[in-house]
Amino acid sequence: MEILNNKTLPELAWLLLGPLVLFYVFKLFIYNVYFHPLRKFPGPWINKISIIPHLYTVFQGKQSYELLKLHRKYGHIVRYGPNELSFSSARAWKDIYGSRPGHQTFVKGTWYDGLSIFAAQDVRSIITERDPTKHAAIARVFGGAFSRSFLNEMEPMINDYIDRFIEHVKTKTANGGVVDLTFGYSSMTFDIIGDLAFGQDFGAIGRETTHPFILELNESLTFTSFHEAIQQFPALGPIARFFFREKVNKLEETARKGGEFALQVMRKRVAEQDTTSRKDFLTKVLEQRASSKVQMSEIQLAAQSWDFIGAGTETTASVMTSTTYYLLRDKKLLAELTAEIRAAFPNADAITNASTEKLELLHRVCLEGLRLPTGAPPILPRLVPKGGDTVDGHFIPGGTPVTIAPMVAALDPLNFKDPLEFKPERWLGKSGDILEASQPFSYGTRGCAGKAIALMEVRVTIAKMLYTFDMELENPDLDWTGNDFNNLLQFGLWVRPLLNVRARLATK
């Protein structure tokens, strides 16, 4: 008793609770490692006990990078949390995201609940809606916006923005100047998708500073990345908010402003519907809305357009930037592709979506640019249906969150030989690589609806850049990606370093 009398209240609390905490951790360790339904799947023992080590990589922006290291060590299947599994095989893409006769759908997990900018109002988009029936209803409304015929209608507008960007590069690089293509490509894709999503020219191309909307978008993606992580471990939420309260408050405020701006721009677009001849993603939707064939509020429309921008701006810009970097690092490949492009076209106006589809080397370069590294989000979680199902030949209990990290599958040495090397020739199909493992647009009915638009932007932009300019890196020794891409951070999407380039007008 004398020992207890000499203790302070906190010391007594620890003395009494400490053994209970240690017993709980020990019990958790024994159960999760030896008796849990996922006990047979490999992974670090600490991850089997708690999701916290994985969440730490999310907060660092290193989620894909750390998952890749785990897959290199453990193979195609990794248990990265007590209840979570990550896969990296081509077969897993089909099993998780595809449609299999006799199998139920693997619906999107709760991870997506934090992605919506209007989650507080319980408004979901074509990307964040988890319910298959509700998603199908949204997809029917916007289906025509991603058709080939719509893309053909929008091509002149898209090409106009690409040509504006080319002129901007000419101005920036005149007299030996340099242009940061990380910033430049981001501004261009933002203007393109912004016009398609909101019917408005935001004027990002040519700005010396980042457009405020892009800043709000990126900050919002950072916030949703934080929110997604917290959702996987709700008890951590109050603790994380306390220690990172200043950062969290700033991110929340920026996300709120982003939502307000999106709604403001949407209201302007709706008001102009009867007086504008411009076409965009919303044209048909607003026509049907006016005739009461579609019931969708302004905030629901804003949620769709916001997510179109989030999914179609930095993703596509990432692919353009990494592809340009790898081309400028490989003079032989750069010369071959430049020769193919300049031989194919009499002038820059002849460079179109249809004409670039015919260029075989350009096609392979773009596929490799999409693989290394992919512009996709870090993970794409789904829930195994009730009763369980098989993934990659293994039975997985129902309710288990399963995912493929697109970057991991694309860089897994079990799928690709020399996975960190930029080798467009692998897409000839003769290297023995498992090409189906690279799915930068995801897979199945919930894959990226804007795939055709993104591919067009990448092909036409790269072709026009190489047709117009002879380019070189400002720093020939630039290691833009870093070891295993650890120079590139992921907070929802990629955060990329500068890519400063010198460009001279080509003489043909």
UniProtKB/Swiss-Prot annotation:
Record-linked InterPro entries: Cyt_P450, Cyt_P450_CS, Cyt_P450_E_grp-I, Cyt_P450_sf, Cytochrome_P450_monoxygenase
Record's keyword annotation contains Mitochondrion: no
Among the GO molecular function terms of this UniProt record, one is: iron ion binding
Enzyme kind, highest EC tier:
oxidoreductase
Q: Where in the cell is it found?
A: Membrane
Q: Which CDD domains match?
A: CYP60B-like
Has keyword ATP-binding?
Answer: no
What are the entry keywords?
Heme, Iron, Membrane, Metal-binding, Monooxygenase, Oxidoreductase, Transmembrane, Transmembrane helix
Record-level GO cellular component terms? membrane
Kindly give the membrane topology term recorded for this protein.
Single-pass membrane protein
Parts of the chain that traverse the membrane: 11-31
**Residues the record lists as binding heme:** C448
> Which EC numbers characterise this protein's activity in its record?
1.-.-.-
| Functional note | Cytochrome P450 monooxygenase; part of the minimal biosynthetic bip cluster that mediates the biosynthesis of bridged polycyclic sesquiterpenoids derived from sativene, isosativene, and longifolene. The sesquiterpene cyclase BipA acts as a versatile cyclase that converts farnesyl diphosphate (FPP) into (-)-sativene as the dominant product and (-)-isosativene and (-)-longifolene as minor ones.
Show the PANTHER family listed in the entry.
CYTOCHROME P450 (PTHR24305), P450, PUTATIVE (EUROFUNG)-RELATED (PTHR24305:SF161)
Official protein name in the record: Cytochrome P450 monooxygenase BipB
Q: What is the organism field in this record? A: Cochliobolus sativus
Its lineage opens with: Eukaryota, Fungi, Dikarya, Ascomycota, Pezizomycotina
